[in-house]
Amino acid sequence: MIYKVYYQENANEIPVRENTKSLYLEAASEREVRQKLKDRNYNIEFVQLLEGNYLEYEQASPNFVLEEI
């Protein structure tokens, strides 16, 4: 399954919506996504499962790149 992760790069700073970034990651569950990213200093705001039409829409975006972890 493919997940879209919304995050702030520095977990020690106050989250600001304009600084929110996203990445795409393949994993079996949301828990696995969080475990894969735990060594990074990210403030994870939201993990969203992509499927169906929404996945197709995201894959059509030039910003769609699966992270390799």
From Swiss-Prot:
Reactions the enzyme catalyzes: RNA(n) + a ribonucleoside 5'-triphosphate = RNA(n+1) + diphosphate
Keyword Transcription: yes
Known EC number: 2.7.7.6
GO molecular function list: DNA binding; DNA-directed RNA polymerase activity
GO CC terms: DNA-directed RNA polymerase complex
Top EC category: transferase
A Pfam family the protein falls into: RpoY
Stated family: Belongs to the RNA polymerase subunit epsilon family.
UniProt-recorded name of the protein: DNA-directed RNA polymerase subunit epsilon
Biological classification of the source: Bacteria, Bacillati, Bacillota, Bacilli, Bacillales
